[in-house]
Amino acid sequence: MSNINVIDILKESDALLEGHFLLSSGRHSNRYCQCAKLLQCPQKAEKVISVIAEKLKEVDFNIIVGPAMGGVIVSYELARQTNKPGIFAERKEGVMCIRRGFEIKKGDKVIISEDVVTTGKSSLEVAKVIEEMGGEVVGIACIVDRRAEDVKTNYPIYSACKLEIETYEKDNCELCKKNIPFVKPGSREQK
């Protein structure tokens, strides 16, 4: 399975976009990874997520939790491939929680699943909920690790690929200076 080229599959799925994007951080970029485009193609998603499943073979865990929205399908497919239960966390009145009859038991060893990790904010919110319920987060699994060098999560990251996408403050964005309109992708509210 190690011969899978994740970047090529992201491009084939139209998940790796070029243009002018306003990110949820408020920064601008000329590239954006929209993993939802990959996840609409089950066979391609299966291949990419198999790269993560392979990396998790030596990790001791018994449940996977994906934050809604991006982590839900990843959690399901990763659970299917690793033969572990997969559940999701979601926001209720703006607060991340585990509900719908799902539970984390004391002592559960948890992998948090995501589509893209950029700042780690959603993962860390889910980690807090898991730890409050008595679970232990043993890692974060994601399709794309987009973190900058200075972004730390306190947990090991198991990704299908690492993407370095440059971002810019609005005042330093060459695309803004050229009056190229931006697109607001993603699901999180912009700052």
UniProtKB/Swiss-Prot annotation:
Q: Which UniProt keywords apply?
A: Glycosyltransferase, Magnesium, Pyrimidine biosynthesis, Transferase
Known pathway: Pyrimidine metabolism; UMP biosynthesis via de novo pathway; UMP from orotate: step 1/2
Query: Which GO terms label this protein's molecular function in UniProt?
Result: magnesium ion binding; orotate phosphoribosyltransferase activity
Coiled-coil parts of chain: none
Q: Which terms under GO biological process does the entry name?
A: 'de novo' UMP biosynthetic process; pyrimidine nucleobase biosynthetic process
What InterPro entries does the record point to? Answer: OPRT, Orotate_PRibTrfase_bac, PRibTrfase_dom, PRTase-like
Residue sites binding orotate per the record: T118, R146
Q: Does the keyword Plastid apply?
A: no
PANTHER family cross-referenced by the UniProt entry:
OROTATE PHOSPHORIBOSYLTRANSFERASE (PTHR19278), URIDINE 5'-MONOPHOSPHATE SYNTHASE (PTHR19278:SF9)
**Which HAMAP family has this protein been placed in?**
PyrE
* Protein's job: Catalyzes the transfer of a ribosyl phosphate group from 5-phosphoribose 1-diphosphate to orotate, leading to the formation of orotidine monophosphate (OMP).
Q: What is this protein called?
A: Orotate phosphoribosyltransferase
Q: Which organism is it from?
A: Clostridium botulinum (strain Loch Maree / Type A3)
Q: What is the lineage of its organism?
A: Bacteria, Bacillati, Bacillota, Clostridia, Eubacteriales
Write the gene name: pyrE
